[in-house]
Amino acid sequence: MKHVYNFSAGPAMMPKAVLAQAQQELLNWQQQGTSVMEVSHRSNAFMALATQTEQDLRQLYAIPDNYKVLFLQGGAHGQFAAIPMNLIGKKGKALYLISGHWSNRSAQEARNFCEVDQLNILTQDEAGVFSVNQTDFSDIAEQYDYVHYCPNETISGVEIPDIPIVGKAVLVADMSSNILSRNIDISKFGLIYAGAQKNLGPAGITIVIIRQDLIGNAQRATPSIWNYATQVNADSMINTPPTFAWYLCSLVFKHLRAAGGLASVEQRNQQKAALLYQYLDNSHFYHNYVAPQNRSLMNVTFTTNNDELNAKFVAEAAENGLHALKGHKVVGGMRASIYNAMPLDGVEALIEFMQKFAQENR
């Protein structure tokens, strides 16, 4: 079978070693004679897995003891609603920093539950190049119950590498597309959330890392499934959780730890992204419209000079085992999502095809 590299923005490529282990254990997990998909979430075996999964994530990120980790359902979209329901307090309003599609979507959902102020931090110059230059919001942040931002916008390929400065305000981050891609200081955040389907595992489970003092202030009408205090007290199992997705996350976390932790992960991600951006900048055939300081390590966007060539590129790339390179419908063009599981070989194969395509279509 032809080797395939999956550049999908999500659900995304998973580590081959993780998939191989899951395949090996599928019918007989921990010598129990059953699949992990069939094991009760209340069983001792699964409870031990859940505990170990949290411990592995805590070690990867050096999560402080005064933070709780939740494994929930509903994806990032669910958290768009859960966050204002749990964090809005006496100030009655939140600030959303808008850097693209997903930060805007989260702000629109939050408006159903609280007053929202939006601040557009994305700029575009005369050449059409996007950048984010403002990162200090300490002069306005403390009038809000929390400040929300999305450090990596998958659609446009814009990443904000510096953590926003918000003074004593609560900082909330949607890290769905760059969680575990590099090391960060968790203590600078009040809450981090992420859908699993890019760097953590398969779709179906959502990680929430929340500072303990922010728990217990949910609005009265908050459904129990979105109430962080209720979920903490129930060990994220107020209802039957997505056990197979949880299990796969556990394998991914162990895989990352065995591969050298987040320092090694970041080094590999920097290497992959640098190689691809360097080729784009020197190609004179493809174009990237993100300023170097804001180029995403995870989602590399590019385009040719016309839509017909873009469509031809995507089709021929797929024929050559390079899948899911079509850009999001909002922006068009192409997008190579090179999350943690994408090997360097995949990026090199993409560049080789890009060179060939450019030569044939100039």
Swiss-Prot record:
Binding of L-glutamate, residues: 42
GO CC, alphabetical: cytoplasm
Alphabetical list of Gene3D superfamilies matching this protein: Aspartate Aminotransferase, domain 1 (3.90.1150.10), Type I PLP-dependent aspartate aminotransferase-like (Major domain) (3.40.640.10)
Organism whose genome encodes this protein: Haemophilus ducreyi (strain 35000HP / ATCC 700724)
Keywords: Amino-acid biosynthesis, Aminotransferase, Cytoplasm, Pyridoxal phosphate, Pyridoxine biosynthesis, Serine biosynthesis, Transferase
Cellular localization per UniProt: Cytoplasm
Family according to the record: Belongs to the class-V pyridoxal-phosphate-dependent aminotransferase family. SerC subfamily.
Pfam family for this entry, one: Aminotran_5
Phylogenetic classification of the source organism: Bacteria, Pseudomonadati, Pseudomonadota, Gammaproteobacteria, Pasteurellales
One of the record's GO molecular function terms: pyridoxal phosphate binding
Protein name: Phosphoserine aminotransferase
Location of N6-(pyridoxal phosphate)lysine modifications: 198
